[in-house]
Amino acid sequence: MAAIVLTTINARYIHASLGLRRVYANLGELRAQARIEEFCLTDRVADMAEQILALQPAIVGIGVYIWNAAEVRSLVGLLKRVAPGVTIVLGGPEVSHLPLRVDFGEADYLVRGEGEIVFGELCRGLLAGRPPAERVLAAEPPAVDALAQPYPFYTDQDLAHRLVYVEAARGCPFQCEFCLSALDHRVRPFALK
């Protein structure tokens, strides 16, 4: 059982989500009540929902990317039909920029921007019975050096059999037309440790 389930649908099994681990790392005392569950595009949405709901979460946070937006929409719809009392929070690049390419109207909350800190604050409020008035929460970019690092939360299995991403900076110095990172205008490097 986990009060908070962090999940996403990776493009392939070999991918290990940096975003989920970054959010998990910054949950602080809520980490003891949280769990990461990753899926890939080849998994059936019904199987994903069953695995998530078996953990009896109060809150499900889902990372949304260009490759999984349609599947996430289906997953959210199924979760809401089967367990309408579960709070669904979406974050990630596909919900951070307007206009939304996919309708996520069934989700309870959308976290736009860099949501590591805001997601934890939202969970604290929800678990204490204090939901926010707004459905869309705008996350201000945190100071990168104030963020807890996600790397301790990769498992030995991840390290041996999956791709482990390293984030050296936030933002991108390039302005590629096809990429959402082009909308971020500032590069903020992490300190080398």
Question: Can you annotate each of these PLM segments?
Answer:
Residues 13, 67, 97, 120, ...:
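Tryptophan-centric aromatic hotspots in well-structured domains and transmembrane helices
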Residues 148-193:
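Radical SAM [4Fe-4S] cluster-binding motif and immediate context
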Residues 8, 19, 23-26, 30-146:
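Glycine-rich beta-alpha loop elements in corrinoid/cobalamin-binding modules
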Residues 17, 66, 113, 169, ...:
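Short, solvent-exposed loop/helix junctions and linker helices
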Residues 13-19:
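Short N-terminal binding/cap micro-motifs at the start of the first secondary-structure element
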